[in-house]
Curated annotation (Swiss-Prot):
The chain crosses the membrane at residues 112-132. The helix-turn-helix (HTH) motif in the cytoplasmic domain of the N-terminus is involved in the formation of spirals to maintain the rigid rod shape. As this protein is anchored in the cytoplasmic membrane, the HTH motif may contribute to protein-protein interactions to form the RodZ helix, which is localized beneath the cytoplasmic membrane. The C-terminal domain may be critical for determination of the rod shape by probably interacting with enzymes required for synthesis of the peptidoglycan layer, including PBPs in the periplasm. It is found in: Cell inner membrane. The gene is rodZ. InterPro entries: Bact_Cytoskel_RodZ, Cro/C1-type_HTH, Lambda_DNA-bd_dom_sf, RodZ, RodZ-like_C. The lineage of its organism: Bacteria, Pseudomonadati, Pseudomonadota, Gammaproteobacteria, Enterobacterales. GO terms for molecular function: DNA binding. GO terms for cellular component: plasma membrane. It comes from Salmonella gallinarum (strain 287/91 / NCTC 13346). This is Cytoskeleton protein RodZ. Residues 133-334 are periplasmic. Cytoskeletal protein that is involved in cell-shape control through regulation of the length of the long axis. SMART domains: HTH_XRE (SM00530). It holds the Pfam family HTH_25.
Amino acid sequence: MNTEATHDQNEAQTTGVRLRNAREQLGLSQQAVAERLCLKVSTVRDIEEDKAPSDLASTFLRGYIRSYARLVHVPEEELLPGLEKQAPLRAAKVAPMQSFSLGKRRKKRDGWLMSFTWLVLFVVVGLTGAWWWQNHKAHQEEITTMADQSTAGLNADKDSGQSVPLDTGAVTSQDTTPAQTAPAPATPVDSTAATQTPAPTAAATQNTVVAPSQANVDTAATSAAPAATETPSALPTSQAGVAAPAADPNALVMNFTADCWLEVTDATGKRLFSGMQRKDGNLNLTGQAPYKLKIGAPAAVQIQYQGKPVDLSRFIRTNQVARLTLNAEPTPAQ
C-alpha cells in the first residue's frame, strides 16, 4: 500500500517539482546545480518551475533535464512519462516564418539598392558621354570657323592681287621703250657719213644708198645687244630682294610634316598668312613682332623663331588648337 501511494504521489508531482525536492534533499542550491551543469541560474529556475525558455530549443531542454536528474539521483525513466504528459516545452514555431519574412525583406532591400546603384551608374555614364560630345562638337565648330575665315582671307587676297599684273606691265613697258628708241641717234651719224662720200658713178651711188641701210641694221643689232645684256643684270637685284627677309632676326620659319591649317598675324594686325599648308611644305614669314599664331594641328608643324625651336608639346598632348604669341627678344650687340 505504501509503495503504491508513493508512486501515485510521484506521478502527481511535475518534473520541476521532483527535481527541486531532490536538490533540496541533497542540500544543493540552484547556483551549485547551475555551476555543475554549466548552465545559467535562470535556466535551472525555469526547469524547476516547468517553464520553457523562449530562446531554448526543446531538444536542448530535454538534455538539460536528464543531466539535472542524474545529478540529483532521480531515475530518468520516471521523468520521461511526465515529460510526455506535461509537454511544457513549447518551442516557438514562429521563428522559421520570421526568418523567411526577414530574408524576404532583406532581398527586397538588396533589390532596391542594386536598382539605385545601376541608376547612378547610368547617370554617370550619360553625363560623361554628354560632356565628351559637347567638347567634340565645340572643337569641330572651331575648326570650321577657322577654315571659313581662312577661305575669306584667301578670297580677299586674290581680289587685291588682281592689280599687280597691270602695274608690272606698265613697268615693263616703260623699261622696254628706252631700249627700242635707243638705236635712233645712230642713224644721223651714218647719214652724214653717207653725204660726205662722193658718188662718181650710178653703181657707186647705188652702193652708197645700200650702205646706210646696212649700217642701220648693224647699228640696231649692236644697240639691241647692250639692252639685252643689261636686262638680265636686274634679275639678281630682285632675287636678292626676295631672299633678304630670310636674314631678318625676327623671321618665322615653319616646316610641315603633314597637312595643317594656320593663321599668322604680326603686331600691326597684318595677316601674314592664313590658309592650309601641305605636307613637306616650308613657310618663311617676316613682320613686326610679336607674332600671333593659330595652328589647327600642332603636331604637324615645326617652328623656329630667332633661330630657336618653339615648344608646342603642351598643345600636342591635349590635342587642341594651338594659340600662342611669339614675343621679340633683343638681339645681342655685336
